[in-house]
C-alpha cells in the first residue's frame, strides 16, 4: 500500500471557511489563511480550497481569496469551485496552486479534461465528483453524479463517469458523498469503494468523516488513496497529527 494522504478541506464562502451538512446549513469555522497556516504546521499532506458558491452563482473562483492562501502554503494545494476553462487554470497555476479541481464544467464539457491534461500534465488535474444514492425504482442510477453543489441531477452513473474521466486524462478523483457530507456519520464506503475499484488513479474519500475510525474505514473498506475531512479538523475535534498517528498504529502507511 502506498502512503495514504490526510487532507483538510477549506470550504470557502464570502472569504470565510464554512461547514454545513449535505452542502447546506453552513456555519462559520475560521479565516482561510489562518486555517491553511495551521494545517501546514500540523503536517497535512495537501490542502484543498473550494469556493463553494462559485458554480451555484455562475461565477469564476474568487482569485483574491485563493491568492492569500497560495502565498503562504508550504504543502501541495488544490483549488476547486468555478473553474471552467484553461484560462482559469493558467491563472491559478501562476499563483502557485498545484492542482485544479474541476467538477460541473467537465460534466457539461468532458473534453476539457483531456485538453487540460495535455496542456498542464495529468498530475495537476483533479476531477471532483459529487455523488448521491437514489432509491430503487427512481429511474435514476443508484449511485448518481450531481453538480452545482449537489443541487442538480445529471442522470450519470458515478462508476461510468469515473472511468470516463480517467480515460480522458484526469490524474485523480476527489469523491464526495452529498448524502454523507457534514454528517460525521462516516464516508459512503459503498460509493467510495465502487469508484476506487473501477479506476487505477488515486481516489480521495470525502464527505462524512467524524471519527478516527472513519478515516481508517475510508482506506481499508473504501479503498481510498487519501482521506479528506473538514468539520473534525476545523473545530479541533481531531488534529492532523492525531489522525496520522491513529492510521499509522492501525498499519496504514502515512507521512509522520
Language model features with spans:
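Structural preference for beta-strand elements that scaffold enzyme active sites
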Residues: 5-9, 46, 74-78, 98-101, ...
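Glycine/small-residue-rich loop that forms an oxyanion/phosphate-binding "nest" at active or ligand-binding sites
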Residues: 53, 62-120
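Charged helix-capping and loop-helix junction motifs
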Residues: 60-67, 110, 155-159, 185-194
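Glycine-rich, proline-tolerant flexible connector loops at the mouths of alpha/beta enzymes
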Residues: 46-65, 104, 174-186
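Glycine-rich phosphate-binding active-site loops on the catalytic face of alpha/beta enzymes
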Residues: 91-112, 177-182, 207-211, 217-241
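Conserved anion-binding
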Residues: 12-14, 18-19, 97-175, 179-180, ...
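Conserved, mostly hydrophobic/aromatic
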Residues: 11, 39, 47, 92, ...
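Catalytic cores of alpha/beta
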Residues: 73, 77-78, 83-96, 190-227
Amino acid at each position: 500500500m502506498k502512503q495514504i494522504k490526510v487532507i483538510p478541506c477549506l470550504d470557502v464562502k464570502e472569504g470565510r471557511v464554512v461547514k454545513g451538512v449535505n452542502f447546506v446549513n453552513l456555519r462559520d469555522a475560521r479565516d482561510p489563511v489562518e486555517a491553511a497556516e495551521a494545517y501546514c504546521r500540523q503536517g497535512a499532506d495537501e490542502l484543498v480550497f473550494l469556493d463553494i458558491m462559485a458554480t451555484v452563482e455562475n461565477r469564476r473562483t474568487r482569485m483574491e481569496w485563493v491568492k492569500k492562501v497560495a502565498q503562504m502554503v508550504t504543502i501541495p494545494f488544490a483549488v476547486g469551485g468555478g473553474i471552467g476553462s484553461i484560462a482559469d487554470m493558467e491563472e491559478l497555476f501562476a499563483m502557485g496552486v498545484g492542482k485544479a479541481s474541476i467538477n460541473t464544467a467537465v460534466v457539461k464539457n468532458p473534453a476539457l479534461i483531456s485538453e487540460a491534461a495535455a496542456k498542464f500534465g495529468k498530475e495537476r488535474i483533479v476531477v471532483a465528483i459529487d455523488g448521491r444514492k437514489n432509491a430503487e425504482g427512481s429511474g435514476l442510477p443508484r449511485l448518481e453524479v450531481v453538480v452545482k453543489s449537489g443541487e442538480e441531477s445529471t442522470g450519470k452513473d458515478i462508476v461510468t463517469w469515473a472511468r470516463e474521466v480517467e480515460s480522458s486524462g484526469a490524474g485523480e478523483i476527489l469523491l464526495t458523498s452529498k448524502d454523507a457530507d457534514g454528517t460525521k456519520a462516516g464516508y459512503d464506503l459503498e460509493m467510495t469503494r465502487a469508484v476506487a475499484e473501477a479506476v487505477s488513479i488515486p481516489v480521495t474519500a470525502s464527505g462524512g468523516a467524524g471519527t478516527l475510525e472513519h478515516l481508517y474505514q475510508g482506506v481499508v473498506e473504501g479503498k481510498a488513496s487519501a482521506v479528506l475531512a473538514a468539520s473534525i479538523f476545523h473545530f479541533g475535534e481531531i488534529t492532523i497529527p492525531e489522525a496520522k498517528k491513529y492510521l499509522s498504529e492501525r498499519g496504514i502507511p502515512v507521512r509522520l
